[in-house]
Amino acid sequence: MKTKLFKTKKYTAMRKYLYILFALCMFLSSFGVWGQPNNTPVSLRWNNGGQAVKGDFIQIGNIRNFSTDAQSSATLKVPTHSSCLRVKWAGLYWSAYVPIGDRHDSRIEQVKFKMPGDTQFRDLRADVHMYSNFANSGDSYNCFKDVTSLLQSKGANFNNGEYTVSGIYSPNTIGSWGGWTLIVVYEDIQAATSKKIYIYDGAEWNFFNYNGTQTKTIPITGFQTPPAPAAIKARMGIFTGAGDRGTGYTSADEIRINEVKQGQNSNPNAYDDFMDESITYNHSEVAMPRNPNTRNHIDIDIFDIPNPGNTVINNGDTSLTIKFVASDAYITYTVALSVDAIAPLLI
């Protein structure tokens, strides 16, 4: 004898809820990571709780080496003669382009890391995984790992040494890029001034089409520069992907601080072609030792912001703006900024 299943009102309502749940799941899967938009906006990662640092930051990095399991290295050298340095904060980022089908691949969040004096790599897993999709053609991810304690364990030997990253996941497909950067905030008790330091990260395309020039502005607040007649100094570092050198989209590819263009007259980091696949320190590729020393659509640039007569950042300023202006698409992974600031006297 067969049992007949009666479709009660309760059963019908449950089936309706299941349909709604299924539709919601399909909607969420059209985003990046579940519940996360396809574009992870660049936002504040670290600013020392708003307190000034008697020191500054330094940034190094390199491309993903497609020929040797993505292994590449760069040399960190703090631009000071002080012998009294210590690590305040350090963050490692690795980023790459992957096909859409690989957006949830667990290998994305894993790399190998080697510091000065190490004889073996150590395995790292990302603390945060950010990513963005461009025109449904592929994904670009950005992974962050706090490595402060690792660098602090080196003492003063964190400086003047080679750092190596291996295993950045990215299939060898046409148009692929990948790379890593290490941002280190250091304290220097011999420093003449204190600085407010801001570290931003994300995975944010500056735009999603090629319909003219578009902009992205990051406001920086919460500091106060010293009073006159002090000369105000500031430093900026960036890590971006998908940049091109001289591709025809260079009529507007700029970084502006308080609306003043940054860069120089020619590549690398030309005023109108800043995102040009260069890895530089103060617009010099020679000043950023790395292996291999090649280009692959990755920009890692750290530079002191020219401020003649305090015409860009003035005495007593409490805010500034960083503006990205471009008619070529690129993705911003990290932005770092330091600026002279008044620090309270600690008794």
Residues covered by each model-derived region:
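Bacterial Sec-dependent N-terminal signal peptides
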Residues: 1-37
